[in-house]
Amino acid sequence: MKDDKNKSRLLFVPSGGLGNRLRAIVSAVQLSEATGTALRIVWFKDWGMGAEWREIFKPMKHYALREASLLDSLVYDRPRKRNFFVPKLFQNLLFEQRIDEYDVTPLKRKNFDFCAWAKGRNSYMSCYQDFGAVDNSLYSDLFSPTDEIEQRIARNLEQLGDAPIG
């Protein structure tokens, strides 16, 4: 068995509304593929996105995405005033480096190299936006709505009729 100590790992927490989370996940997937970094995604149901992953999407085929547990809320949630920044204490112990969601925009403005940052390290990142060039074909590869959501979409399309405006 190979020594796994030097393997790159990224625990990724997407945040914001659905569109923001999907853009952030696509960026994290591209980062993972570009660097050979093992990607784990933890999905938090919160005020920004009031649904669990499994309520809207089928499981991802090639990436580990799981719903957040109560323990995850303590350890992996985004550090904020309302959780007294407690998760940051655990994250500083568990990860070599971390990027919080509010750090991403300033880093992008400085042309930060996210790939160099992630490669060879055990990292944590929370994010609500894309970071890096996004391959739009990944959206359909990664995100497959549940059958119930597909049926709701079909019903809504039928109601639009033949001449929708907008």
Residues of each region from the PLM?
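Short amphipathic alpha-helix
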Residues: 24-31
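Juxtamembrane luminal stem/stalk of type II transmembrane Golgi/ER carbohydrate-processing enzymes
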Residues: 1-9
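Short, hydrophobic/glycine-enriched beta-strand segments
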Residues: 8-15, 165-166
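Secretory-pathway luminal glycosyltransferase catalytic domains
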Residues: 52-166
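A short, glycine/small-residue-rich beta-strand->loop->alpha-helix junction that serves as a flexible
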Residues: 14-23
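A short beta-strand-loop structural module common to alpha/beta enzyme folds
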Residues: 38-48
